[in-house]
Regions:
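Glycine-rich, basic loop-to-helix element that forms the pyrophosphate-binding segment
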Residues: 69-85
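Conserved donor NDP-sugar-binding/catalytic core segment of glycosyltransferases
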Residues: 102-134
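Conserved nucleotide-sugar donor-binding catalytic segment
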Residues: 146-222, 226-229
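Catalytic core of nucleotide-sugar-dependent glycosyltransferases
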Residues: 206-212, 219-245, 259-262, 266-288
Length: 327
């Protein structure tokens, strides 16, 4: 029987300068219909007063633990929080987003009903405050392999950790420690999914990711934004080599190459990325044949591959005028 001595869910929250968005985030956490949770708020060197805000939240609510560290990045903050987690389940979310009021309850019940190690819902971007009225549906059980393929290819799942509830011990602090600041959450998810035998997908917008005014597709990018993502994709490809996930991972890797090239082509100043762009072009040429015959690449992505390979000027125009951000 569940006792109140141990929280049912530990919610780990890296906090770095969320500003005005922290209060609505905290309200959405405290409005959860499942109330037996522990929140570990890890201040990652905030400079906007958030350190004081999380201390105040911890004084007002005994379920909240405030932790402080020098700025080390979201991955390090998550790892710090996960190491302190006491719950039977674990969820990592961001301090400027919102959760559906039934998110925790629905994901926990899905795990319990299917004896699953993982449950996840849709990851939904928003600009206006979303409606909380949607009723969570029954979950769809999946094998661990199907969940990993979904992670790589299904945009409903997204790469983020925020919409994924794990049983304690599946996602570990060591999995979260890595040298990358971009797609580090994808790498952690991929590693954790390897320990999953059964997962459950709930097809509803349970997690709402706030879209800020400045988007990567409309502002300058820095080289590590691209090189970190390429490094993470290579690690996933290497990890899948020789397994039943190899073909799926190869398709994912090719899609990532196309995405990274598209990000370079969206920039008005591209000279900084010339060396990386040459590397991407070479890998795109090498993988083109397999990509065009892959069952894991959709028609739209194959069309992008054709444009990139056969008519680069048109591909460049498409990237500049039509494409949107995709993590």
């Amino acid at each position: 029987m569940q006792t109140e001595a141990r929280p049912l869910v530990s919610v780990v929250v890296p906090v770095y300068n969320p500003g005005e968005y922290f209060a609505p985030f905290l309200a959405s956490l405290q409005a959860q219909t499942l109330q037996n949770w522990q929140a570990i708020l890890v201040d990652d060197g905030s400079t906007d007063g958030s350190a004081e805000r999380i201390d105040s939240a911890a004084r007002a609510d005994a379920r909240i633990l405030a932790v402080h560290q020098p700025n080390s990045g979201a991955a390090a903050a998550r790892a710090r929080g996960v190491a302190l987690a006491e719950g039977e389940f674990l969820l990592c979310v961001d301090s400027d987003d919102l959760m559906h009021p039934q998110m925790l309850r629905a994901l926990v019940q899905a795990c319990q009903s299917q004896n699953a190690q993982l449950a996840f819902c849709r990851f939904a971007p928003f600009t206006e405050t979303p409606s909380p009225d949607t009723e969570p549906p029954a979950g769809q059980p999946l094998s661990g392999q199907a969940a990993r393929e979904m992670l790589l290819h299904d945009q409903r799942l997204d790469y983020a950790l925020s919409n994924k509830l794990f049983r304690a011990g599946v996602l570990t602090a060591d999995m979260l420690r890595c040298p990358y600041r971009y797609n580090e959450d994808l790498l952690a998810s991929w590693r954790a999914f390897a320990a999953v035998q059964t997962a459950v997908f709930l097809d509803f917008d349970g997690y709402h990711c706030r879209q800020h005014a400045a988007s990567t597709s409309h502002s300058g990018i820095i080289l590590p934004f691209l090189t970190d993502q390429l490094a993470v994709a290579k690690l996933i490809l290497q990890d899948a080599e020789g397994t039943s996930l190899q073909a799926s991972a190869k398709a994912f890797y090719y899609e990532k190459l196309l995405y990274l090239e598209s990000m370079i082509l969206r920039q008005s100043a591209q000279s900084e990325f010339d060396s990386l762009h040459s590397t991407l072009r070479a890998e795109l040429r090498c993988g083109f044949h397999d990509a065009m015959h892959s069952a894991f690449l959709g028609t739209g992505m194959k069309a992008c591959a054709l444009l990139s390979r056969r008519v680069p000027p048109v591909w460049h125009a498409v990237c500049r005028l039509l494409l949107r951000d995709k993590r």
